[in-house]
Curated annotation (Swiss-Prot):
Expressed in all tissues examined. Phosphorylation of Tyr-795 by MET blocks HRAS binding. This is Ral guanine nucleotide dissociation stimulator. Residues 656-667, 726-753 have a biased composition (Low complexity). Its main location: cytoplasm. The Ras-associating domain interacts with Ras. GO terms for molecular function: GTPase regulator activity; guanyl-nucleotide exchange factor activity. Residues 112-237 form the N-terminal Ras-GEF domain. Residues 301-324, 650-669, 708-754 are annotated as: Disordered. Residues 779-866 form the Ras-associating domain. Keywords: Cytoplasm, Guanine-nucleotide releasing factor, Nucleus, Phosphoprotein. PROSITE patterns: RA (PS50200), RASGEF (PS00720), RASGEF_CAT (PS50009), RASGEF_NTER (PS50212). The lineage of its organism: Eukaryota, Metazoa, Chordata, Craniata, Vertebrata. The gene is Ralgds.
């Protein structure tokens, strides 16, 4: 290997530059042998070498090494050395035989590279042109993708046109400085119009777009950019007012979907009775799942009530029409042309009762592969419409604030679809009260098979929704039903559930997403030969629909863990680069979704849209009607578990530190089944407490809670969201970015592996620089703080440093929970050690050192029961028992 370092003429910013005067030229004739030759009139040749046993061992050092920072004209540059290969290297045989020559060696040039780390808004905008001219196109891409987090479209245009507003429309010298400047600005504005045209959708006057048109007319008359700008303006002006979303409601308008009833149906597939579920031989019943340490944990989950009318466009099955290439995806889509009449299906249409529930399990008449394909079609269409920068933590975390109810509608649509799939699973399992346990078990088996088909199609969103619904309290507690489920189906259910295990920050689901994100087919362990043979026979290349919640939590974590500004007023652009790494993964997976080739099936779509909705209270009540609570004791749930399955699940368990003697044993057993339906909260680790009354609120309004584990006696359940720092995951809802945890003790051993760690070592390039949840890294950590209420209890993540005292942390938590009218002195901070023990943080203590670092970093912000000057009796212990006196009980409310 040859490595050369030399002084050259200075290059443009962002490109290669000389290291320093008198730099040495070195030749590495082997990986561990370096020959340095000094410049004339300097030191002689110096040879450094040692013996390396295997010449094929990879080089350990990175190709890029940071050496410092520079502050130039209000911009902080990160300085690094980067090795650039000049010629291909020698082959393995050449090196072993020693017949390599100068041309066969690896030639590297070490260059000095400057990248923008932070700067003022004016400097960041001004740097767009030099970065483009210096071949640092990544800067332009990152800026256009993330600038909405720290400025507006109007401000960027004003600063750009102010700085570069004197371009001569006709350059006297072809290729001269003026011509290069004009080409750079034209390329930047053209990229902006093509990729983010929704930024200019500001009805009714479209001021930003008209400003751009005026600038282009003056400086680039007759150019292609002028034509495209005029075309976009004409298209936006032709849209109806209702089709254009005001910028005040959302950072960028998105595709407006018409209700399904207004869209023409697509041709239906004629399914013969042979594809319906046929009678199968009697199989040995499977054991009822006792998931004390359930691997299906939704890492970025956040429970949301049903969609409000303005945000309730049902996902349609009509294929998305093609858009003009000059029009952004934010424009309104018209329905597709009327297709030919659909063929009549070979099964009866679903019958419904007065309450909207299915009277018969017509699900069994739809083959599992058909159901999975239709879910994948719906999920893929919605995921492709997601506006990636809406996932930014600074935008997504604002959705619950007043006036932001319509923020990020494309993400809300994916949330609604996830809820609808989970609701469909629960409704088909519980809706028909006349079904016997054996019939209901066939429905459960059918859904497990649908989940398997979703895995084959790499649809991690619906796969996760189905598994979450099957592990909801309402279905999990049905002992008799699970006893009738075949052992083979139950093993498949377990295997699929392991995909979303929260071990090592959901590393398995993240690795699968990296491995299969852009691959042609899924790599399966369950019947791989049969599946791969079927995939090859069809010859269809598949896309990937991820669990979007993983990306949302990663981006919210980044937004919380990294500062927006450095040194007071300099925008932290390094933070935007890391955010773009996640957004780029979303865009890549969106492109992969174009590989799906699935025909919409009209009758399944009509059946799915007509499915009634069950609230969490309704689903639990129906479950109790099928099997009264007294018959669902947790001790009987494991009665028919085989030894192998018991051992398999016990490996995920650890001895419990305390056992509950509560009479509601069945609810606590179900509480071990940690199900969390979807999506990251606005503040990294928001969680929601649910009670049997069925009322709830959340930081996101969309998630239906009908498939949430529910306690019949009103015992509080807390569902934790994932706080993963980054994910390669994508897809709409990353495979498993949310986690749930029960606040009540369990009658069976509780898993000690649920440490809620949020490390993604080896998965993301920026994970090592972020603090981990449930771990103190350096002088900071992230805690989750909730209000001391029973209903609608939302967890907010707080970044705590070693310098933060209790009043500071309390104020941060109050700001997150919108308690602006109260004073920090009115609240106290308690760490949840266990169900019955809480650690009170002293008034002026340093939270970082006062907290119990061995327990979960979960805190409660509790209003003081006494005035600050009143005398309060404290026990000798630092822990506080749960207060049950009526006089000390704090009023409960929905926040």
């Amino acid at each position: 290997m040859v490595q050369r370092m030399w002084a050259e003429a200075s290059g443009p910013i962002g490109g290669a530059e000389p290291l320093f005067p008198g730099s040495r030229r070195s030749r590495s004739v082997w990986d561990a042998v370096r020959l340095e030759v000094g410049v004339p009139d300097s030191c002689p040749v110096v040879l450094h070498s040692f013996t390396q046993l295997d010449p094929d061992l990879p080089r350990l050092e990175s190709s890029t090494q940071e050496i410092g920072e520079e502050l130039i004209n209000g911009v902080i540059y990160s300085i690094s050395l980067r090795k650039v290969q000049l010629y291909p290297g020698a082959t393995k045989g050449q090196r072993w035989l020693g017949c390599e020559n100068e041309s066969a060696l690896n030639l590297y040039e070490t260059c000095k590279v400057r990248t923008v780390k932070a700067g003022t808004l004016e400097k960041l905008v001004e740097h767009l042109v030099p970065a483009f001219q210096g071949s640092d196109l990544s800067y332009v891409t990152v800026f256009l993708c993330t600038y909405r987090a720290f400025t507006t479209t109007q401000q960027v245009l004003d600063l750009l046109f102010k700085r570069y507003g004197c371009i001569l429309p006709y350059s006297s010298e072809d290729g001269g400085p003026q011509d290069q400047l004009k080409n750079a600005i034209s390329s930047i504005l053209g990229t902006w119009l093509d990729q983010y045209s929704e930024d200019f959708c500001q009805p009714p006057d479209f001021p930003c777009l008209k400003q751009l048109v005026a600038y282009v007319q003056l400086n680039m008359p007759g150019s292609d950019l002028e034509r495209r700008a005029h075309l976009l303006l004409a298209q936006l002006e032709d849209l109806e007012p209702s089709e254009v979303e005001p910028e005040a409601l959302s950072p960028a308008p998105v595709l407006s979907l018409k209700p399904a009833s207004q869209l023409e149906p697509a041709p239906a597939l004629l399914l013969t009775p042979s594809r319906a579920v046929a009678s199968t031989p009697v199989r040995e019943p499977a054991p009822v799942p006792v998931l004390a340490s359930s691997p299906v944990v939704a890492p970025a989950s956040e429970l949301e009530p049903a969609l409000e009318p303005p945000l309730d466009p049902e996902p349609t099955l009509a294929p998305a029409p093609e858009l003009d290439p000059t029009v952004s995806q934010s424009l309104h889509l018209e329905p597709a042309p009327v297709p030919a009449p659909a063929l009549e299906p070979s099964w009866p249409l679903p019958e419904t009762t007065e309450n909207g529930l299915c009277a018969k399990p017509h699900l069994l008449l739809f083959p599992p592969d058909l159901v999975a394909e239709q879910f994948t079609l719906m999920d893929a269409e919605l995921f492709k419409k997601v506006v990636p920068y809406h996932c930014l933590g600074s935008i997504w975390s604002q959705r619950a604030k007043k006036g932001k109810e319509h923020l990020a509608p494309t993400i809300r649509a994916t949330v609604a679809q996830f809820n609808n799939v989970a609701n469909c699973v629960i409704t088909t399992c519980l809706g028909d009260q006349s079904m016997k346990a054996s019939d209901r078990a066939r429905v459960v088996e059918h859904w497990i098979e649908v989940a398997r088909e979703c895995r084959v199609l790499k649809n991690f969103s619906s796969l996760y929704a189905i598994l979450s619904a099957l592990q909801s309290n309402a279905i999990h507690r049905l002992k008799k039903t699970w006893e009738e489920v075949s052992r083979g189906s139950f093993r498949v259910f377990q295997k699929l559930s392991e995909i979303f295990s929260d071990e090592n920050n959901y590393s398995l689901s993240r690795e699968l997403l990296i491995k299969e994100g852009t691959s042609k087919f899924a790599t399966l362990e369950m019947n791989p030969r049969r599946t791969q043979r079927r995939q090859k026979e069809t010859g269809v290349i598949q896309g990937t629909v991820p669990y979007l919640g993983t990306f949302l939590t990663d981006l919210v974590m980044l937004d919380t863990a990294m500062k927006d500004y450095l040194y007071g007023r300099l925008i932290n652009f390094e933070k935007r680069r890391k955010e773009f790494e996640v957004i780029a993964q979303i865009k890549l997976l969106q492109s992969a979704c174009n590989n799906y080739s699935i025909v919409p099936e009209e009758h399944f779509g009509a059946w799915f849209r007509a499915m009634g909705r069950l609230s969490e209270a309704e689903s639990y009540n129906l479950s109790c009607e099928l099997e009264p609570p007294s018959e669902s004791a947790s001790n009987t749930l494991r009665s028919k578990k085989s030894t192998a399955i018991v051992k398999r699940w016990e490996r995920r368990q650890a001895p419990s530190t305390e056992l509950s003697t509560s009479s509601s044993a069945h609810s606590k057993s179900c509480d071990q089944l940690r199900c969390s339906p979807y999506l990251s909260s606005g503040d990294i680790t928001d969680a929601l407490s649910v009670h049997s009354a069925g009322s709830s609120t959340s930081d996101v309004e969309e998630i239906n809670m009908s498939f949430v584990p529910e306690s019949p006696d009103g015992q509080e359940k807390k569902f934790w969201e994932s706080a993963s720092q980054s994910s390669p995951e994508t897809s709409g809802i990353s495979s498993a970015s949310s986690s749930t945890s029960s606040s009540s003790a369990s009658t069976t051993p509780v898993s000690t592996t649920r440490t809620h760690k949020r490390s993604v070592s080896g998965v993301c390039s920026y994970s090592s620089s972020l603090p981990l949840y449930n771990q103190q890294v350096g002088d900071c950590c992230i805690i989750r703080v909730s209000l001391d209420v029973d209903n609608g209890n939302m967890y907010k993540s707080i970044l705590v440093t070693s310098q933060d005292k209790a009043p500071t942390v309390i104020r941060k938590a109050m700001d997150k929970h919108n308690l602006d009218e109260d004073e920090p002195e009115d609240y106290e901070l308690l760490q949840i050690i266990s169900e019955d023990h809480k650690l009170k943080i002293p008034e002026n203590a340093n939270v970082f050192y006062a907290m119990n670092s061995a327990a979960n970093y979960d805190f409660i912000l509790k209003k003081r029961a006494f005035t600050k000057g009143a005398k309060v009796k404290h026990g000798a212990s630092s822990t506080l028992p749960r207060m049950k006196q009526k006089g000390l009980r704090i009023a409960r409310g929905i926040f």
